[in-house]
Amino acid sequence: MSLKKQQQQSDFSAAPARRPPTLQSYHTSPDPRGKQILRQSASFTALNNPRMDTALPQIQDAPSNSKRNSDEGFGTKPRRKNTFSSFVNSVLGSPRNIKISAPENPVHVTHVGYDNQTGQFTGLPKDWQRMLQASGISKKEQEQHPQTMVDIMRFYERNAAGAGDEEVWHKFDNAILRQGEYPDGMSPASATSPRFPQNHEGSFENPRAAPPPPKPSQSSPVPVLSSTIVPNRVAPKPPTVGLIPSRPPPQPPVVSNRAPAARPANEPVTTPPIPENEPVFVNAPPVVPSAIQSPVQYQQQQERAMAAAQQAIIDKQLDRSRSQPAAAVARPRPRTRQSTAFDVRAKLQAICTPGDPTKKYYNLNKIGQGASGGVFTAYETNTNKCVAIKQMNLDLQPKKDLIINEILVMKDSKHKNIVNFLDSYLHGLDLWVVMEYMEGGSLTDVVTFNIMSEGQIAAVCRETLSGLQHLHSKGVIHRDIKSDNILLSMDGEIKLTDFGFCAQINDSQNKRNTMVGTPYWMAPEVVTRKEYGRKVDIWSLGIMAIEMIEGEPPYLTESPLRALYLIATNGTPKIKDEQNLSPVFRDFLHLALRVDPEKRASAHDLLKHPFMSICEPLNSLAPLVKSARISRAQEKAQKGGA
């Protein structure tokens, strides 16, 4: 019996261990489906992930069990995928319909260049190629001044795209206001710009652009330190027992590429005093301690060593800064927050006169139409004085922030040779700006229908220069001096207009004011997109003087693109029958039309020129004004009859 038991035990130990059969319940039966094949979802099948092949055993190779587990029901259909499987299948398994939205605010950018090897312009659209062919600029002229061609084409493109319409809003970029001009709580647009730094009358000659910021070096930047430096952490107090660190000071921390946080300008920078009895370890040699240090003492010594290393770095950088000038730190240009329509309206309400302007002015008569509103003549109720009113829809103004600055500057620019600002109102959605009305019209009609003498030309130049000198002293560049913007009274008084508010109240449509961006009065530095200052107004005055001589400015009969080319390349324009002019007049024009702005005269210089001594009285211009009005009325009648 014992032998039989031993044999059974040896057989049992030699046989491989097998899983005991699954217990069958009374309601279970063999699975009629046979072998169970694991189904894969469509998403995993589509992925064809090799990990699935290696991680999961092959179902076909596994031994099948004909018995079902007790939790399986008989004859049940395959269960549907759960919610998670359906979600994965919808994301990965099924193809997604790609929906591409339409572009928003598309901008077509044209990059024009010139290839010196081929002698051809690159990046020219077909429209520009046709324009260049029809401009009248020969191939030889293009090859002689390729860079000038690129500059003027970019200039013309910018004006043709509509960007030139906003130029009028930048006349006051440099304006200087007296202290306390702004109402409380207002933060109007800055009166200065990077192109025109803040200036005074003596320094506002030819501003230069700021030099480009230095390029960052490949190595880690060294922060520029001031004379007072705040360490990252205050050095701890020395321990009671004088101890020397058992190891040399650690290496200085590597300066990270992240720039340190800027400190507010008004925050005082102070350095905490260092106790006199605290030793400073700089390059201290290692010394074996005489006693075992506690963890607290060791931590304190490590902090002291770190503070000493930082102090050593600071001392070296201070010595270096004293011997070498510190490199300029490039600061990002601050961006002025764009005011909302609500903010602009709130600021305008603070500076505009309250009340209903329709009760103060009556008999409004429309005499002109601008891009954002109309120009009317009206009469003041109390004085019966005729005024000009510009009604502007604020929603159509491209530069709402600058309107506030211009109103404040115009209030401070009272001058006898400037069409003065009288009042402003907010009426509904419109801004009403009330200005002086010059019933004589513009100088354009005078030069078109009359021949002026040198004395009369000198009188116009003197009055214009007087107004320009006042504007320049305020930091204002007019940038659009021409006969259209010189208005006269019936008595011959002369005043400058068009400062953003005053539209062309002359309703005549001619080549001067209908063509977009025709720069016949512009200085060469404007056409070639260079930095410029107040001397651009002096050049325009010289061109206007030629206009009074010949009846039109130079190059008026040329195409706009060729006019740009001639202004940029010819320099001082030639005057027809220049020999018929007096020497003093020729010298006056020569000083005003210098190509180099540095050598061009200022308004102050030209007011002292001998040409001013031959000025005729202003009332001598009254007959010319009346004659021009009659001729203009007859011309309108003829056009109307035809």
Curated annotation (Swiss-Prot):
Its main location: cytoplasm. Residues 1-12, 38-48 have a biased composition (Polar residues). Belongs to the protein kinase superfamily. STE Ser/Thr protein kinase family. STE20 subfamily. Pfam families: PBD (PF00786), Pkinase (PF00069). Keywords: ATP-binding, Cytoplasm, Kinase, Nucleotide-binding, Nucleus, Pheromone response, Serine/threonine-protein kinase, Transferase. SMART domains: PBD (SM00285), S_TKc (SM00220). InterPro entries: CRIB_dom, CRIB_dom_sf, Kinase-like_dom_sf, PAK3-like, PAK_BD, Prot_kinase_dom, Protein_kinase_ATP_BS, Ser/Thr_kinase_AS. It comes from the Eukaryota. Residues 217-227, 254-266 have a biased composition (Low complexity). One of its GO terms (biological process) is response to pheromone. It comes from Talaromyces marneffei. Residues 361-612 form the Protein kinase domain. It catalyses: L-seryl-[protein] + ATP = O-phospho-L-seryl-[protein] + ADP + H(+); L-threonyl-[protein] + ATP = O-phospho-L-threonyl-[protein] + ADP + H(+). Residues 100-113 form the CRIB domain. The lineage of its organism: Eukaryota, Fungi, Dikarya, Ascomycota, Pezizomycotina. The active site is at D480. This is Serine/threonine-protein kinase pakA. Its EC number is 2.7.11.1. Gene3D superfamilies: CRIB domain, Phosphorylase Kinase, domain 1, Transferase(Phosphotransferase) domain 1. It is found in: Cytoplasm; Nucleus. One of its GO terms (cellular component) is cytoplasm. ATP binds at I367, G368, Q369, G370, A371, S372, G373, G374, V375, K390. Residues 1-82, 180-276, 317-338 are annotated as: Disordered. PANTHER family: SERINE/THREONINE-PROTEIN KINASE SAMKA-RELATED-RELATED (PTHR45832), SERINE_THREONINE-PROTEIN KINASE SAMKA-RELATED (PTHR45832:SF22).
